[in-house]
Curated annotation (Swiss-Prot):
InterPro entries attached to this UniProt entry: MFS, MFS_dom, MFS_trans_sf, NO3_transporter
Subcellular location: Cell membrane
Record protein name field: Probable nitrate transporter NarT
Topology class, membrane: Multi-pass membrane protein
SUPFAM superfamilies, A to Z: MFS general substrate transporter
Source organism per UniProt: Staphylococcus carnosus (strain TM300)
Function: Probably required for nitrate uptake under anoxic conditions. Also possibly involved in excretion of nitrite produced by the dissimilatory reduction of nitrate.
Gene3D superfamilies reported for this sequence: MFS general substrate transporter like domains
Organism ancestry: Bacteria, Bacillati, Bacillota, Bacilli, Bacillales
Length: 388
């Protein structure tokens, strides 16, 4: 394997993922300002914030498959060109419908995740795949970049002009990928239908998808709802709330490679059991939190577990599904993205019914318990699957 080429592609694709996630998550940190200019209800805000997750999740399957057919270079390049249009539309938005339409197509920025996790393992030996995928996953930091930088920039030049700056980011990364992307990346041409049939027959596909639904779903959901939630429930300023949300995202992102390293060294399923146990504890803390300190402790606990858990799950995907890695990555990452779609809606609904959001966090704990049951079942049903 060409180590220098692998290092270059890991760097370029990780930075490209940063750019994609910056765009994918741009609406959430700017929503407090957007809602001042566009008349929008609380329920509509939840929908607008969740909409980018839909396309960003569903497209991960074809993006993973296309990566094996034409290579990461052209999937990334095409995605960045496409994203120019919804970014411009968002900068011109004057109604809720325009926000929804722009947000839907911004989902392309989230879909590029499955490109790298399909491409990167081709450049590294098996005992380094977990670490390599973990480093690539740090591209999730793009969400934190938007959370940290977008609110103060918008405070200075307005949210519309801030969004237009992202046009420059996309153009730059399209050029970078055009010149530095690997046109000679190894291709895997197995019919999509055949790959999908095999995966749908494998219990591990469903279990990995469920685990990632929780770990990555938590990462996405907290990144989406925290800025507005902290402003509404704890009366923080928009900038302060954005910084705190960014810290949550940054911790989860930087710990993702640690999950990959742990998965390279010990059995990843065993490590996931411990990880989910602590996530359950964090969710329970959030469910009973009545002050900012306790809420912060709960958020930080979930952040740590989400980051490590993300790395552990994507250590297992190429380990279990070598020939079907592209589609498997797409399916699992799609479910992770969808895991971020429902929580903001659930929190809004539960709060409207009960007057508090506490019960919504208890749902996260219950999902964690179900995940532990599936891990136990996987090991009991056939230990060779868990230690393959």
């Amino acid at each position: 394997m060409n180590k220098s080429k692998g290092g270059l592609q890991l760097t370029v694709q990780t930075l490209s993922l940063v750019a994609g996630f910056m765009v994918w998550s741009i609406i959430a940190p700017l929503m407090p300002m957007i809602s001042q200019d566009i008349k929008i209800t609380s329920s509509q805000i939840s929908i607008v914030l969740a909409i980018p997750v839909i396309l960003g999740s569903v497209l991960r399957i074809p993006f993973g498959y296309l990566t094996n057919i034409i290579g990461a270079k052209w999937v990334f390049f095409s995605s960045f060109i496409i994203l120019l249009f919804p970014i411009f539309l968002l900068s011109q938005a004057q109604s809720v419908n325009m926000l929804m339409l722009a947000g839907f197509f911004l989902g392309v920025g989230g879909a590029v995740f499955s490109v790298g996790v399909t491409s990167i393992p081709k450049y590294f030996p098996k005992d380094k795949v977990g670490l390599a995928n973990g480093i690539y996953g740090m591209g999730n930091l793009g969400t934190a970049v938007s959370s940290f930088l977008a609110p103060p920039i918008a405070g200075a030049i307005g949210w519309q002009s801030t969004v237009r700056l992202y046009l420059i980011v996309m153009a730059v990364f399209a050029i970078v990928m055009f010149f530095l992307g690997d046109a000679k990346e190894p291709k895997v041409k197995i019919p999509l239908v055949a790959q999908t049939k095999d995966l749908l027959k494998d219990l591990r596909t469903y279990y990995l998808s469920f685990w990632y639904f929780i770990t990555f779903g938590s990462f996405v959901a907290f990144g989406i709802f925290l800025p507005k939630y902290l402003v509404d429930h704890y009366e923080l300023t928009t900038v302060d709330a954005g910084i705190r949300a960014g810290i949550f995202i940054a911790i989860a992102t930087f710990l993702r490679p640690l999950g990959g390293i742990i998965g390279d060294k010990i059995d990843a399923v065993k490590a996931l059991k411990v990880d989910f146990l602590f996530m359950i504890i964090g969710a329970i803390i959030l469910g009973i939190a009545n002050d900012m300190i306790l809420f912060t402790v709960g958020c930080l606990t979930v952040s740590v577990c989400a980051g490590i858990g993300n790395g552990l799950v994507f250590k297992l995907v190429p380990q279990y599904f070598q020939k079907e890695a592209g589609v498997a990555n797409g399916i699992v990452s799609m479910m992770g993205g969808l895991g971020g779609f429902f929580p903001p809606l659930v929190i809004t609904y539960v709060t409207s019914i009960t007057g508090t959001s506490h019960l919504a966090f208890i749902f996260l704990a219950l999902f964690g318990v179900l995940a532990l049951v599936t891990m136990w079942h996987l090991s009991k049903k056939n230990r060779s699957l868990a230690y393959k």
